[in-house]
């Protein structure tokens, strides 16, 4: 299969020329895909193209979409969760999170996840495979078509560990930036932190994108190594002090501050002593802490930290000179919130 989604204008012009068409036919395909974001992804429907050209493209296996719709769930707050199927019959989920002025797409980078974080539903069924850039981009089109508005912001916080799929991730970011016209500064890549991958991410970003202007969000979730290992098994391979050092280097390499995600778990990491430890870890370099309320999943017994503890924790970080914010959960009533995405449609 040859997917047209993710192709540049030049790529599409060359395809047109290869079929004996004028270069502007490639530009027409580009406009049909990216400018109109057409709901109908069938090449037969690109009526501006000659019928014989459309037939040849279709016969030769060209497609605009590799995903198909399974189901959707609309939460009370307007958040939309989509369950989509791949051509090899795997399932992925993505989420559209609307506000008055924004539509944020929460995208998956893999089918499942190998990291097995104890608080997250995605990793409970393991990793099936990584997604291609075209499959990542297709999620945007599905969200836009279902919500009838254009996506303005992207967060790679869906299923999978993006840093274990770096090249396809960056190819999708290039298209999001150049073709979907979404600034890199409106894109966030979330990672649980994989050894040696932060330096690779910055290096490959400069090679593929020419720069590195997106936000890197590291799922830290603990203020010390012992606690982190209890909730993130992969932490045994990457000490927290090394994560911080590599984060500092990422800031030097890119000029972009790093965001640290911190999931507040009652009795695990939500005490003031943890806030002080975290402050000592992060003091002195360009970073930001994002506190997150825990979203319940069936398989584990973690509990959400109280709002009082969260507020005290936030105040202590702020008083210690750490830039901190609190991210409210969206889509909780439809299992569309952070940590609740799965590979299948169970727990409806």
Curated annotation (Swiss-Prot):
Keywords of the record, alphabetical order, are:
4Fe-4S, Cytoplasm, Disulfide bond, Iron, Iron-sulfur, Metal-binding, Methyltransferase, rRNA processing, S-adenosyl-L-methionine, Transferase, tRNA processing
This enzyme's EC code(s): 2.1.1.192
Molecular function via GO = 4 iron, 4 sulfur cluster binding; metal ion binding; rRNA (adenine(2503)-C2-)-methyltransferase activity; rRNA binding; tRNA (adenine(37)-C2)-methyltransferase activity; tRNA binding
Catalytic activity from the UniProt record: adenosine(2503) in 23S rRNA + 2 reduced [2Fe-2S]-[ferredoxin] + 2 S-adenosyl-L-methionine = 2-methyladenosine(2503) in 23S rRNA + 5'-deoxyadenosine + L-methionine + 2 oxidized [2Fe-2S]-[ferredoxin] + S-adenosyl-L-homocysteine; adenosine(37) in tRNA + 2 reduced [2Fe-2S]-[ferredoxin] + 2 S-adenosyl-L-methionine = 2-methyladenosine(37) in tRNA + 5'-deoxyadenosine + L-methionine + 2 oxidized [2Fe-2S]-[ferredoxin] + S-adenosyl-L-homocysteine
Give an example GO biological process. Answer: rRNA base methylation
User: What does the entry list under GO cellular component?
Assistant: cytoplasm
* Free-text remark on how the cofactor is bound: Binds 1 [4Fe-4S] cluster. The cluster is coordinated with 3 cysteines and an exchangeable S-adenosyl-L-methionine.
The UniProt entry lists the main location of this chain as cytoplasm
Record-annotated Radical SAM core domain positions: 99-333
Q: Does the keyword NADP apply?
A: no
Q: Which family does it belong to?
A: Belongs to the radical SAM superfamily. RlmN family.
- What exactly does this protein do? Specifically methylates position 2 of adenine 2503 in 23S rRNA and position 2 of adenine 37 in tRNAs.
Which NCBIfam families does the protein's record reference?
rRNA_mod_RlmN (TIGR00048)
**Please, what other remarks does the record include?**
Reaction proceeds by a ping-pong mechanism involving intermediate methylation of a conserved cysteine residue.
Name by which UniProt lists this protein: Probable dual-specificity RNA methyltransferase RlmN
Question: Which gene produces this protein?
Answer: rlmN
